[in-house]
Curated annotation (Swiss-Prot):
Glycans are attached at residues 3, 164. The gene is gpr4. It is found in: Cell membrane. One of its GO terms (biological process) is cellular response to acidic pH. The chain crosses the membrane at residues 9-45, 50-80, 86-121, 130-156, 173-210, 215-250, 261-289. It is a multi-pass membrane protein. Changing residue 119 to A: Decreased proton-induced G-protein coupled receptor activity. Keywords: Cell membrane, Disulfide bond, G-protein coupled receptor, Glycoprotein, Membrane, Receptor, Transducer, Transmembrane, Transmembrane helix. Residues 157-172 are annotated as: Extracellular loop 2 (ECL2). Its main location: membrane. It comes from Callorhinchus milii (Ghost shark). GO terms for molecular function: G protein-coupled receptor activity. Belongs to the G-protein coupled receptor 1 family. The lineage of its organism: Eukaryota, Metazoa, Chordata, Craniata, Vertebrata. This is G-protein coupled receptor 4. A multitude of proton-sensing residues, which include extracellular histidine residues or triad of buried acidic residues, contribute to activation of the G-protein coupled receptor activity and pH sensitivity.
């Protein structure tokens, strides 16, 4: 163990006082309303007995909790990494901030597995894909991530640097238990879910490719959505966990060497800020690009649409903008083709006739 003092690393916290707070403000402005819409749309799907809505609901709650912690962190970075709200609030907001990263990843994994079962094995796992099962799985995800990331609640997380700034959830060099916890976060909290998601979406692509009844346009839509998810997951979370792993490995090898910490400090904070973009990507990829959820959002915004656009009789163009069509969602159709597959997650009807139809159409 390194016995150097807590301010032995000459960290200049003034270097990153612009980018993180700017990005956090952007995420709050965009992420809060879109996740509120996602929350409402997911709730509607849950009421329709759609198990995908359960995961979307929990994902939106996780993102909103994350966004709720951003204002004090904006203040923290604007004051050059100086926490002024006391030790208990540091523990609380830091715990929520870091834990929700992995809760979000956990529910993205749940959605990936659910979509894989729906597309690749629509009949074999039909009984597993139920609202009650999704609720139990969601409770397990919350319990595991909260328990696995609760250690900082029992340690002092305020540390002063050479500028008399009070760091929150940051110590340079880090402590032994933090380095070990970081390894768990990297391999269990990030790498394992990412490999699982990659496996699921490769299975989805194989199932779509081998099914001759799937239309070409629908195949392209599913592939774009799948590949875009992997890309955004890598963009939002991979840089942070790569740097986190590097910091932990270097510390465990040379606990008293601050050179690496000093050189990578700004990059570490930038990568941490990039994880917040997941709160903007989630509702676009998994809710607003969803046929059922998109129609619910459009219908829910209809009163506001009429109120703010009373002088504009033609509402068609506005309705198209509300759907937030992205490169991952093709233009909206009047009704899904009976020969096409979808990642919509809509629950079919009960009974023998619906099962025969599902077997013939191979739909979600």
């Amino acid at each position: 163990m390194c016995n150097v003092s807590q301010d032995s690393c000459n960290i200049d916290s003034r270097l990153d006082s612009l980018f993180p707070p700017t990005l956090y403000i952007f995420v709050m402005v965009i992420g809060f309303p879109t996740n509120c819409l996602s929350l409402w749309a997911a709730f509607v799907q849950v009421r329709q007995k759609n198990e995908l809505g359960v995961y979307l609901l929990n994902l939106s709650i996780s993102d909103l909790l994350y966004i709720a912690t951003l204002p004090p962190w904006v203040n923290y970075f604007l004051h050059q990494d100086n926490w002024i709200h006391g030790p208990e609030s540091c523990k609380l907001f830091g715990f929520i901030l870091y834990t929700n990263i992995y809760i979000s990843i956990g529910f993205l994994s749940c959605i990936s597995v659910d979509r894989y079962l729906a597309v690749a094995h629509p009949l074999k796992f039909a009984k597993v894909r139920r609202v009650k099962t999704a609720a139990v799985v969601s409770a397990v995800v919350w319990a595991i991530e909260i328990g696995a990331n609760s250690a900082p609640l029992f340690h002092n997380e305020l540390f002063e640097d050479r500028f008399n700034h009070t760091f929150c959830f940051e110590k340079y060099p880090m402590e032994d238990w933090v380095a070990q916890m970081n390894l768990y976060r990297v391999f269990v909290g990030f790498l394992f879910p990412w490999v699982l998601m990659l496996f699921c979406y490769q299975g989805i692509l194989r199932a779509v490719k081998t099914n001759v009844s799937t239309e070409r346009e629908e195949k392209a839509k599913i592939k774009r959505l799948a590949l875009s998810l992997i890309a955004i997951l890598l963009f939002c979370f991979a840089p942070y966990h790569l740097i986190l792993l590097s910091r932990s490995v270097v510390y465990l090898g040379q606990p008293c060497d601050c050179t690496f910490e000093e050189n990578i400090f700004t990059a570490y904070h930038v990568s941490l800020a990039l994880t917040s973009l997941n709160c903007v990507a989630d509702p676009i990829l998994y809710c607003l690009a969803n046929e059922g959820a998109r129609s619910e959002v459009t219908r829910g915004l209809a009163p506001l649409m009429k109120f703010f656009s009373a002088s504009r009789p033609n509402m068609d163009s506005f309705a198209r903008s509300v759907t937030l069509d992205t490169p991952w969602s093709s233009r909206r159709a009047a009704a899904p083709s009976p020969r096409s597959w979808s990642l919509c997650g809509q629950t079919g009807g009960r009974g023998r006739r619906s099962r025969v139809r599902r077997r013939r159409d191979c739909k979600c």
